[in-house]
């Protein structure tokens, strides 16, 4: 392999790949508009040593089917992962552009038609449904999971293991649903800062509910207040640390009778009954003082800071279930799938390894931080988005903390009867209704968990039986 030199300044020009779409979505697609500056990035001997002992894939091209191009366009930089893949491994990626509407049809057509396609973004439908459709190969023969670079990710990787094989090997986790709030508003209302509660291990459902009730009760005559808005249902249910569908490595089973899940659903009932939840869709933290907590992945934070210049915004992980030892969070795993019949298993595995290195090596993480803290401005110089260093640094601790556990539920990957996001109760998937039906209250949705569970439990049992027959 070529051994090239790099300069520190150029390393800091690299952009780190964004890992996933917002929680509740279906994929770990890359961020839009990947581009390269005029300066190429070269790598020193230490960097080129990352492929020691790996198969020689120099000259190979991976055909990647996706919505966004992994290669640079316009005038931005290559990602760290792509730079390593091209400069160390000597391989290339050719993107086959698709759309969100045709992505899965395009994948099936290319597989069935024998057209080249090697790599595909992990989608929540990938396992078990995509595997059972014959769309993917497992990665066991290509990735050495005993390599220390996978330390800290092993537990999550094991959760995705299906039929004894590793079809999904997440290289990073992102987009945890977090609670954004105004520290100024918290102080004005005489409430305890959620960050202080989190640091003391006291940020749980009880503290969350109590502060919202106080905030709403403090409303003046004629003032409308809500405790929370945003993406809450799934975050509440998954904060129990339990999934709707369990898998023991051989059989699936329904967990809809779980007492912990019932408590989460009863909490949603209470939020609705007390009118604490505002179902209005907000793209940023509301700046009118009407909402205390905004639940959303942090993609909004830069713009929310601009929209709330005097708010002193901060954020904390979603509160834990009372008595829980950890924070179980709704987030997205970034992973790439090896497509069925591909002869580029070694190359796809190498790219996955590059993504993992990009997410974990300190110099690349520092490069990502420097880019993240750059203000976004219009041509006229108006700031449209920014993060504070305090916000950024605290968010990074979530991905290394032993007290935070990312959640995964096979239920999202069991076909359209189980997962189908629509705005109609009768056509939504079971998972969608179970996660936030009691909050969203689309027409026809029962008002209680007991009724909702009873209406859909039979479908869960049927789907579980269907997939167990394939084991």
Q: Model segments located where?
A:
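Glycine-centered hinge/linker elements that transmit conformational signals in sensory
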Residues: 212, 247-280
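Extracytoplasmic/periplasmic solute-binding protein
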Residues: 120, 161-173, 177-179, 187, ...
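Extracytoplasmic/periplasmic substrate-recognition and gating elements
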Residues: 306-381
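Short, solvent-exposed loop/beta-turn-alpha elements that line the ligand-binding surface or hinge
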Residues: 140-152, 197-200, 220, 242-262, ...
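Bacterial N-terminal signal peptides that target proteins for export
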Residues: 1-8
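Hinge/lid segment of periplasmic solute-binding proteins
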Residues: 36-58, 122-176, 206, 316
């Amino acid at each position: 392999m070529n051994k090239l030199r790099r300069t520190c300044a150029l390393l800091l020009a690299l952009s780190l790949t964004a890992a996933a779409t917002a929680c509740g979505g279906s994929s770990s697609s890359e961020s839009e508009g990947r581009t390269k500056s005029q300066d190429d990035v070269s790598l020193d001997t230490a960097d080129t040593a990352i492929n020691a002992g790996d198969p020689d894939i120099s000259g190979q091209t991976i055909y990647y089917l996706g919505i966004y191009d992994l290669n640079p366009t316009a005038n931005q930089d290559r990602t760290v992962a792509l730079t390593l893949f091209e400069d160390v491994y000597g391989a290339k990626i050719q993107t086959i552009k698709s759309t969100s509407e045709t992505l899965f049809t395009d994948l099936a057509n290319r597989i069935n038609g024998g057209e080249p396609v090697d790599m595909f973004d992990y989608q929540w439908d990938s396992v078990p449904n995509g595997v059972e459709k014959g769309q993917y190969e497992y990665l066991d023969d290509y990735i050495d999971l005993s390599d220390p670079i996978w330390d800290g990710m092993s537990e999550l990787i094991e959760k995705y293991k299906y039929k004894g094989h590793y079809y999904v090997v997440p290289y990073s986790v992102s987009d945890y649903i977090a609670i954004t709030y105004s520290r100024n508003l918290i102080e004005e209302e005489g409430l305890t800062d959620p960050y202080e509660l989190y640091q003391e291990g006291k940020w749980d459902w009880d503290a969350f509910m109590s502060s919202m009730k106080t905030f709403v009760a403090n409303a003046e005559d004629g003032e409308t207040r809500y405790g929370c808005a945003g993406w809450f249902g799934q975050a509440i249910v998954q904060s129990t640390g339990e999934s709707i569908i369990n898998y023991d490595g051989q059989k699936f089973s329904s967990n809809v009778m779980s007492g912990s899940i019932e408590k989460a659903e009863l909490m949603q009932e209470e939020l609705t009954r007390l009118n604490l939840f505002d179902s209005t869709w907000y793209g940023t933290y509301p700046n009118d003082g009407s909402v205390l907590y905004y639940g959303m992945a942090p993609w909004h934070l830069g713009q929310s800071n601009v929209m709330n210049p005097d708010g002193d915004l901060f954020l904390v992980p979603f509160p834990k279930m009372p008595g829980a030892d950890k924070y179980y969070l709704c987030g997205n795993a970034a992973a790439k799938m090896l497509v069925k019949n591909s002869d580029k298993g070694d190359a796809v595995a190498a790219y996955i390894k590059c993504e993992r290195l990009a997410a974990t090596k300190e110099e690349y993480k520092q490069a990502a931080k420097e880019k993240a803290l750059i203000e976004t401005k219009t041509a006229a110089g108006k700031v449209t988005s920014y993060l504070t260093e305090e916000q950024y640094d605290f968010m990074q601790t979530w991905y290394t903390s032993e007290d935070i556990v990312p959640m995964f539920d096979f239920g999202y990957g069991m076909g359209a009867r189980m997962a189908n996001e629509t705005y109609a109760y009768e056509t939504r998937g079971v998972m969608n209704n179970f996660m936030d039906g009691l909050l969203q209250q689309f027409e026809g949705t029962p008002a209680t968990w007991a009724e909702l569970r009873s209406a859909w439990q039979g479908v869960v049992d049927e789907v579980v039986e269907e997939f167990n027959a394939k084991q």
